[in-house]
């Protein structure tokens, strides 16, 4: 498994912040969802879905 490049993650977070400042909240949220998905895929490459935390009621 490769290491997570913190610099690239920070750059992507900066991009999301720029999108938020521009007022495009939908795109910012979508970019955060993509980043989250990629990070989880990276860290859970060998894990099963059974170990996932249950979702809070507002996330269901």
Swiss-Prot record:
Signal peptide: none annotated. Pfam families: YciZ (PF23675). HAMAP family: UPF0509 (MF_01641). Belongs to the UPF0509 family. This is UPF0509 protein Ent638_2183. It comes from Enterobacter sp. (strain 638).
């Amino acid at each position: 498994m490769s290491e997570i490049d913190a610099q690239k993650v920070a750059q992507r977070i900066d991009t999301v912040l720029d999108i938020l400042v521009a007022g495009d909240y939908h795109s910012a949220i979508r970019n955060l969802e993509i980043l989250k998905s990629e990070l989880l895929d990276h860290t859970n490459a060998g894990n099963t879905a059974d170990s996932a935390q249950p979702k809070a009621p507002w996330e269901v």
